[in-house]
Amino acid sequence: MLRDKFIHYFQQWRERQLSRGEHWLAQHLAGRSPREKGMLLAAVVFLFSVGYYVLIWQPLSERIEQQETILQQLVAMNTRLKNAAPDIIAARKSATTTPAQVSRVISDSASAHSVVIRRIADRGENIQVWIEPVVFNDLLKWLNALDEKYALRVTQIDVSAAEKPGMVNVQRLEFGRG
């Protein structure tokens, strides 16, 4: 019932607004010649078309072109990365192949990360390393660098706290190819 009243009042309001608009339009066009009416109609159509083009069509077209360009760039980058991935993985794995090369990489990177190596031994597929007590954060940085740069992963490690805070004793450390 309330809904019906609302609909009825809305329809009455709409009819009044339409009749006012028709009255205003008829009043302005009443004294005009047919030629002026045609020119006014053409001007209204022209202004509407220009407004539509400037406010809606052109910004949408530019945005679509930008998105297409970004999409093409992303597709090209994706293709390059997919093509480069096997080469990168192969280069990482083949960077250190012989035990002598692996030992050299381990010792060079250890000195760069403040890790002192006591002994390195070849254990078939793996390399076992004995090191002096080391700062825990330095040990983590060194192990992370070996993993990221040379694909050498820790296969076994035994760590215990040293007497000094922040220092650790590494009883057993073994690397394998990742």
Swiss-Prot record:
Chain ranges passing through the membrane: 40-60
Q: Name one Pfam family in it.
A: T2SSM
Q: Which InterPro entries match?
A: T2SS_GspM, T2SS_M_periplasmic_sf
What residue ranges lie in the Cytoplasmic compartment?
1-39
Q: Which cellular compartments is it found in?
A: Cell inner membrane
**UniProt xrefs under Gene3D superfamilies:** General secretion pathway protein M, EpsM (3.30.1360.100)
> Residue ranges, Periplasmic compartment?
61-178
Which keywords has UniProt assigned to this entry?
Cell inner membrane, Cell membrane, Membrane, Protein transport, Transmembrane, Transmembrane helix, Transport
An annotated GO cellular component? plasma membrane
**Misc note:** In many other E.coli strains this gene is part of a type II secretion system, but in MG1655 the locus is missing a number of genes.
By sequence similarity, the record places it as follows:
Belongs to the GSP M family.
User: Would you tell me the protein name for this molecule?
Assistant: Putative type II secretion system M-type protein YghD
> To which species is this protein native?
Escherichia coli (strain K12)
Q: Which gene is the coding source of this polypeptide chain?
A: yghD
